[in-house]
Amino acid sequence: MKIKKQLIAILTLAVIAFISLSAAEFNLKYMIAEVIYGDKNSVESEILFSKKAGFYEEEFYLSIYAPSDEIYYTLDGSEPTKESMKYEGAILVSDASRNENTNSMRTDVCGSFLTDETLYQVPDYLVDKCTIIKAAYYDKEGNRSESEERAYFVDFEEKSGYDNINIISITTEPENLFGEEQGIYVLGNTFKEFAENNDLSASNYYRWGANYLNRGKEWEREAYIQVFDEEKTLVLSQSVGIRIQGGVSRGLLPKSLNIYARTEYGNNRMQYDFFDTGYYPQRVTLSSGGNDYYGKMLDRLGAELTEECEFCTMNYEPYALFLNGEYWGFYYLTEKYDEHYIEHYYDVAQENVIIIKNGNLEVGTEEDKEAYENMKNFVEYADMTVEQNYQMACTMLDMDSFIDYFAAEIYMSRQVDWPSANYALWRSREVSEKPYEDGKWRWMLFDVNTAALISDIDDHDTLAYVLQESKMFANLYTNAEFRETFSARLLEMADTIFEESRIVQMVSEYEELMGEPMENNHQRFFGTSNDVFYYRAKMIKDFAHTRKSYVETMLKVNAVD
């Protein structure tokens, strides 16, 4: 049946082509081959491209077919109109990297360019580029069709930094990214208003009001993604929504992006198993590394070291981003914690999931938030030296999850923006026989890219710090059973999860994978080599060598008689 449909489509296209194209332009044999082996949705589409999106060793001519000869196309990600280029015949697609830089030369994407700081540089060379062709046609009544687009990467086998990583092309109307009014990636009008009413010297540039600091659905923009796996095979083409992601890192470069699948964009799930876990998420994050912008490995390392612990961790996959056709850096694509994540990995129905993040309700009802506050107040203020109170706390919390989470964060020397922020926990609302539908709160690890796992904080007394910063942990620590269990688990982690050779091996593997991609990233945004990347890797290895002895001392110093 599938073959029959393809043959019908081929014959139909042949007739259309015969009518609308001259004999010199029309090559039936060529067209049939390309329709059969074109994009997986090409037979169903009204607009057909003679080449599927992807990677090509040599330049080629691209033909576009539609039910009308009024076909228009763009090369900058914008929607085609009658003001765009009209398709008059096959288009030569060559290595777009030879074209002049456009958006990569912008200085309105970060406040740093308005200061004397020299952290970021616009590229003084031609950055790598792909060709984005977005086409639409007009019928006899003047109605415009939905647009179709393809990303073409030509001569990339000669370019370094793309082996063994995935590629994602994101395209959207340029105004969605860089417009003064609606652009989510620029200082924009929000900054103009901020500058008129504030002394810029009174705060760091990354805290200045700017479009990219704005949040919420109104600052989400429709975009189109094309994802290519490590073999450079197209695995996903989908309309999505994009937003800037992060806290302070919104004011840095490059910026992280949240990517949303929604019914309004055509599908409420990503149609690709990004992490080979059978999970088709609604949301993912393209993470720039946050404050770990020189190394970009701390979040992944923290998650992979602790993936067998009794708390949630994310999966990470390496990507190079091309934004409206231009190279835009190295990223890790990660999951987002939400009810769909919990349903998939913990077999808890999404409507039964409650998630609290940084003390705020992420998933659930106001009654659920009240239940969280009641638990929090009890654990923080009840006398935990009374055994009955401690046992009550154990019915509210998954104590193994709590201990694993705090032990891991403390061993990693997490501080500064934790535990007062960057924490999350979840539970089921209703109780059942399922192991994770027991109504107990469990913890979620994320954002380990600030003050963690590096040698200049290997001697930090993180236990004393947490005893001051977390009322919940401090109160539980007054209980002898809790202290004994926590201390034993922390020492066990030192010899297993955080054992030196294990960390060194992981970091060495990251260096092998990320070395060339990070060279591209550092040249693109900092105008430097990636020496600092390897230095960051060395700092992690040094931390692995020395941290254990400090942890042992830390437990002794904070012992309770």
Predicted segments with their positions:
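Extracellular structured ligand-interaction cores
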Residues: 59-61, 88, 130-132, 149, ...
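Short, compositionally stereotyped local motifs that mark structural "simplifiers"
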Residues: 3-214, 219-222, 227-229, 236-241, ...
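Short strand-loop junctions, especially beta-strand C-caps/beta-turns
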Residues: 76, 287-291, 475
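Middle-to-C-terminal accessory/interaction subdomains
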Residues: 173-190, 195, 199-201, 213-215, ...
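Short, glycine-/Ser/Thr-/acidic-enriched flexible segments
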Residues: 69, 78, 98, 175, ...
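Short, conserved micro-motifs enriched in small and acidic residues
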Residues: 125-129, 292-300, 397, 401-402
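Conserved ATP-binding subdomain of kinase catalytic cores across diverse folds
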Residues: 170, 194-369
